[in-house]
UniProtKB/Swiss-Prot annotation:
Xref: InterPro entries: DEFL
Record's subcellular location: Secreted
UniProtKB keywords: Antimicrobial, Disulfide bond, Fungicide, Plant defense, Secreted, Signal
Native species: Arabidopsis thaliana (Mouse-ear cress)
Pfam families on file: SLR1-BP
Signal peptide residue numbers: 1-21
GO CC annotation terms, alphabetical: extracellular region
Disulfide bonds: 36-86, 48-74, 53-80, 57-82
UniProt-recorded name of the protein: Putative defensin-like protein 169
Organism phylogeny: Eukaryota, Viridiplantae, Streptophyta, Embryophyta, Tracheophyta
């Protein structure tokens, strides 16, 4: 009984240390790493519309990436910014 108890305590103590050590050694990536944001090149003056901005970003060939298309969002300065995969 005593050996089983000490073995269990040892396992419960060693496994979390191993897992923590393995997790620390893995490279951590920032969630937005590899994504770029550029202004829409041919934006007309006037207020920015999110739906139109997103549609125009998806139409731009320069913002296409493998497996998807760009997303557009209006900035606080009424500029359309296209977010796309740049790596």
């Amino acid at each position: 009984m005593k050996k089983t108890f000490s073995f269990t305590v040892l396992i419960l103590f060693v496994i979390p240390l191993l897992v923590t050590g393995l997790m620390d050694s893995m490279p951590q990536r920032h969630p937005v790493e590899g994504w770029c944001k550029r202004p829409l090149p041919n934006q007309k003056p006037g207020p920015c519309n999110n739906d139109r901005c997103s549609a125009r970003c998806k139409e731009q060939k320069q913002f296409e990436f493998k497996g998807g298309k760009a997303m557009g969002i209006c900035s606080s300065e009424n500029r359309c910014l296209c977010t796309f995969r740049c790596r």
